[in-house]
Amino acid sequence: MSRPALRIAGIALASLAAFVPRPAGAEADHVIVLPPFLVEEQETKPWLNRPIWSHGEAGNIEILSACPEDETQLFIEGLRTQRMELGQIIPDEFLLHTALPTTFILFPQSLKSTMDADLTREWERLPAASAAHDRLRPLDDLRLTDPDSSYLFVILNDAKWKETKRGSEFIFSPSYLRFLLEARTPALPAWFCEGATHFYESILIPWDKNGFEPDPWLSKDAASVLHEDAFAPRPFLPLRELFIPALPAGRTEQYRHVWNAQAELFIRWALSGKVPGGRDRLWRFAAAAAVQPVTEELFKSCFGMDYDDARNALSDYLPQAVWEPLKGPSAPSSDIPPMALHDATPSEIHRIKGEWGRRVLSIVKEYNPEAVPIYSSQTRQLLQGSFDRGDRDPRLVASLALFRLDTENSNGARELLEASPAARSARPLAVLELASLRLAEALDAPSGSNARLSEGQASGILECVAASLGKKPAIEGAYVIAATVARHLGREPSDSERARLNEGAHLFPQNSELVFQSAAWDLRAGAVAEARRLIEMGLWEATNPSARLKLLDLEAVGPLGTGW
């Protein structure tokens, strides 16, 4: 019996609307929440007097819009402006960048009832709908993310949009900013992601004139006390506890509350002008903390003061922070020309709608599996139908292969990917899934001596891994596959193979097993210094006691145990 392939894909979900799954045993009349449903429709509607969909792609943004061109261009302008404004407090390299453009599907509020009616009609045809008497509520805005790309569905309020002439508040909402920070590799420290997100929540629009609201601290009452008495007692953590990679289990809710508030205060203090060059110092410190353990020496090299002095400075700044707004940096000038839009081709429409349908399928499977036939049928019609009509756009072929994997057709997925080098090149996720399929087959029938993988089997897998590397963001699964191959070969990894594994361990130090294996291979190869660096970072990041114990045991053996 063949073993299942290791799946790389993991859809990350975010929505402005509360995504309310139906609990097991829910009573009748429970509200069913389903993702936006995009049908394969005709390309024009006479009463609109225009093609339904327009398309544009520039830089790292792709647009498929059912909105009029002026609204679409206003959205794009707002999106670009917000990204530049955000860069004044958070550098662009701290945000997620993906190999593929971020795709936005824009839909006008005025046409939403038509889309919802399509979904309702399909839902009511299902036996489960009539039996359960469920009420349907389609979602509005939704973000779905694969390791190599993001798709966002945005409903534009036609009337409000023309009134405000400003970018959508959804685009860089605090939750979206948190996602962009936390999904970046190597991972930024938790205190930075938490503090920057909470600080961003205090932004006042337009922020270049109004800046940021005063620090909310622990509560309005706690802030009021400090406003009236700057010397009033306040809970404050030592900075060595603030800069840990993650809060340990067992901490009280009050401790977490103080930790979150102090992380925000630290970001605000660094950007307040109280520290000369504070913004650059903060960025330098956060970047360093993403790739090495945080020590007081590291902090001092960035801020020019030790932990005690910085803690005192933070505490002294707090009474001012809770009553005084923080001035925002000057907004950058924007002279980016409008994106070139054109009537979307059938290939573009089917590719983007089909990929959207593939992504929402995983959510529907988890929360409302009875609705899977609606989405799988529509997605198959969009992707397979377009393929059958001769469309060989590499991204569409890659999406079709991933859809086949998602619907338990691994043989069909592999057939597509093996036959289409262009599809493998178009999406890192697709070529990694092929690596996973080859690995599963090789482990099921190893052709090397002593039930080990042969060099030929390993080469076929690792060439797919190599094709995915060097693109943003790095995908953890690529290094996990490479490590699995190394474990099942009848030899030690070569220097170049170890370098690739070490790269993965440095990028994903939270993966204690990857760190452990890479450090062990380094030790056996005599690369003691590299093993030491990996173990130090692994111990800094490890939260699981057994994982820490394995790393400590490795540290105690061989050259590390006697040569430090």
Residue ranges of predicted features:
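Juxtacatalytic substrate-recognition/specificity segment
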Residues: 27-43, 47-193, 204-207, 244-245, ...
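Bacterial N-terminal signal peptides
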Residues: 9-18
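Residue at a conserved register position within TPR or TPR-like alpha-solenoid repeats
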Residues: 200, 404, 438, 445, ...
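Beta/coil-rich, acidic/histidine-enriched accessory regions frequently appended to metallopeptidases
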Residues: 28-29, 34, 291-446, 460, ...
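Bacterial N-terminal signal peptides that target proteins for export
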Residues: 1-10
